[in-house]
Structure formats: structure tokens, C-alpha cells
Amino acid sequence: MVTNSQEGETLPATSSVTGLPQKRFYRQRAHSNPIADHSFDYPARPEDVDWRSLYPNIGSEQQVEFADIGCGYGGFLVTLGEMFPDKLAIGMEIRVKVSDYVIDRIAALRMKNAETSAYQNIACIRTNAMKYLPNYFQKSQLEKMFFLYPDPHFKRAKHKWRIINQALLSEYAYVLRSGGLVYTMTDVEDLHKWIVSHMTQHPLYERLTDEEANADPITPKLYQSSEEGAKVVRNKGDHFLAIFRRI
């Protein structure tokens, strides 16, 4: 329940029609400073992660294989869960209200689909992936990583805060298996050029050809499955896609 400060009345945070949480009660600024000293609980090592608390039906040999970094309001994460029911996907989001929304959204979807066990394969955690990614994933654990509409950090002095940079690319390569894929999408051409430049210069990545990218069944979903992507489509903005393979 959420209190309307103007009216003094208590409003439901969940729609009575869909049973899903309403985004207007979870609003937060578009981006968060990744360098700030946020307070996070994080595991000391991947072996300490309690995955069963996030995925109730997880098998003893199962591991998270997809990571949506900066998952926003979870639209694309939900799509991943629908497309790959046998894979475990995690959304990582730094903003507290936004991550709360995704967690509540997944809980509501699981409840609505209790008979089919749908959406048991997706989860969200609030964390700073720029700092704590290796604390969650073992070497070569991930098959796919997604960076969709990341903060462009337009000012030159803040380019070091961009989630794609040389130091972090080595961390991503560590948790990605050989042949694993990194999907990037932005509506900012300058950021797209930055991503392509940094990833093609890194010795552990190669860019997929247009033919390879277009043949990937995930590619069409990258454009508007996420809330940010859908907004770009509504505003008739540009999309800049680049997919890279871990060598």
C-alpha cells in the first residue's frame, strides 16, 4: 500500500485489474551514480550466494546463465523468462525503488501463473554490478549478458563511469564462457561508438556480423521489450545495436 501525500489516503500499489505492481508508485530518477558509496549486502564469493531464495525451483546442478545488467523495470527480463523457460536469468539494478518494483512484479507474475510455474526462472537483485559482479558469478558461468540503454554519462569527466570500459570488460570476460555473448543497445550514437570502440579493441571480444546478429532470435526483442526501448520506439528515436562474442 502507498500513501497519497496530497490526499492523505492509502492507495494500492498493485493494480486491481492485472494484479501487477503499478510503476507510478515506484518512480525514481532515471540513473544512479555508480561510484557513490551505496549500502549493499553482497556475497564475499559466488559460493555464498543463496540462489534458492531467488529461484525456488532451482535444480541442484542449475546455475544462472543470463544476466541483465541494469535491468530497469524488468520488461526485457520478463521476456527472457518467457523465451527461455529452462534457463535462469538474473536482473541486476542499482536503484532501490526500481529493483523493488521488479521484485514485486516477478512475485505477482509467479502468483498469477502458479499452476504453470512460469516466471520461476527469473529474479532481480539490487546491487552495483560495476563493483560486485565477480562476487556473484564464477569464472565462465554466464552464457549471455545484456546492457540495454545504459546511462550514457554525457559529460567527458564522467565517461569513466560508463558501464562499458576497458577494466570492466575484463571482468565481464572472466564471468562469460567462451562463445558467450554480450548484447548492447542504446539510443545514443556517441555511446554506441564508445561501446564498439572499446569492445573491438579488447582482445577477448569480437563483434558479430550483421547477418549473425539478425539471425539471433533475441535481437527483435531488444528493441522494445524493455520499457526504455518501448519509449524510444514511441518517440521514433534511433536504436544502435552491437553484439559481441567472448573469444
Curated annotation (Swiss-Prot):
Gene3D superfamilies: Vaccinia Virus protein VP39 (3.40.50.150). S-adenosyl-L-methionine binds at residues 70, 93-94, 128-129, 148, 226-228. The active site is at residue 151. One of its GO terms (molecular function) is tRNA binding. It is found in: Nucleus. Pathway: tRNA modification; N(7)-methylguanine-tRNA biosynthesis. Keywords: Methyltransferase, Nucleus, RNA-binding, S-adenosyl-L-methionine, Transferase, tRNA processing, tRNA-binding. It catalyses: guanosine(46) in tRNA + S-adenosyl-L-methionine = N(7)-methylguanosine(46) in tRNA + S-adenosyl-L-homocysteine. Its EC number is 2.1.1.33. InterPro entries: SAM-dependent_MTases_sf (IPR029063), Trm8_euk (IPR025763), tRNA_(Gua-N-7)_MeTrfase_Trmb (IPR003358). Pfam families: Methyltransf_4. It comes from the Eukaryota. Its main location: nucleus. One of its GO terms (cellular component) is tRNA methyltransferase complex. Catalyzes the formation of N(7)-methylguanine at position 46 (m7G46) in tRNA. Belongs to the class I-like SAM-binding methyltransferase superfamily. TrmB family. HAMAP family: tRNA_methyltr_TrmB_euk. This is tRNA (guanine-N(7)-)-methyltransferase.
